Amino acid sequence: MATYSSNEFRSGLKIMLDGEPCSIIESEFVKPGKGQAFVRTRIRKLISGKLLEKTFKSTDSVEGADVVDMNLIYLYNDGDFWHFMNNDTFEQLAADVKATGESAKWLVEQAECILTLWNGQPISVTPPNFVELQIVDTDPGLKGDTAGTGGKPATLTTGAVVKVPLFVQIGEIIKVDTRSGEYVSRVK
């Protein structure tokens, strides 16, 4: 497997750390006035999902993680597993709760997701950046209730709760940014 020098660290790079595949979230090269240069990184462990900060000397190198990112279509959830299909080979893969994690609330049938595999097993699921979901429960917006810039909580078909503007009603379909969990717009 390839090795990466700490000078090659970039956001999104997958490396092995303590026997577990990790993804670099951000890296900063620091060259102090006195002493050796180093790289300060924020890393997410792909299996456990833990965030950690680690400092590497400029001469350090680490092994690249043998992980594969695949674009797959989300099919359905049977209660224990979320099932995905490769559109080219029609091969199906099942991801458990540990792999889907927080992204389960953004999975919409027939949406293209990124499944990260390590040793042939799914370890993380990345939903599309934007999803369109229907509102199943929210407080009614009263006419003239526009004081303030706040919103109201709305429950979506997947169970996710998003803060929406006061004019949005039950039954409407909205567009949500899955990276931040924020309301983007109404869908016509």
Curated annotation (Swiss-Prot):
Gene3D superfamilies: 2.30.30.30, Nucleic acid-binding proteins. GO terms for molecular function: translation elongation factor activity. The modification N6-(3,6-diaminohexanoyl)-5-hydroxylysine is found at residue 34. Pfam families: EFP, EFP_N, Elong-fact-P_C. Pathway: Protein biosynthesis; polypeptide chain elongation. SMART domains: EFP, Elong-fact-P_C. One of its GO terms (cellular component) is cytosol. The keyword Protein biosynthesis applies. It is found in: Cytoplasm. The keyword Protein biosynthesis applies. May be beta-lysylated on the epsilon-amino group of Lys-34 by the combined action of EpmA and EpmB, and then hydroxylated on the C5 position of the same residue by EpmC (if this protein is present). Lysylation is critical for the stimulatory effect of EF-P on peptide-bond formation. The lysylation moiety may extend toward the peptidyltransferase center and stabilize the terminal 3-CCA end of the tRNA. Hydroxylation of the C5 position on Lys-34 may allow additional potential stabilizing hydrogen-bond interactions with the P-tRNA. Involved in peptide bond synthesis. Alleviates ribosome stalling that occurs when 3 or more consecutive Pro residues or the sequence PPG is present in a protein, possibly by augmenting the peptidyl transferase activity of the ribosome. Modification of Lys-34 is required for alleviation. This is Elongation factor P. The gene is efp.
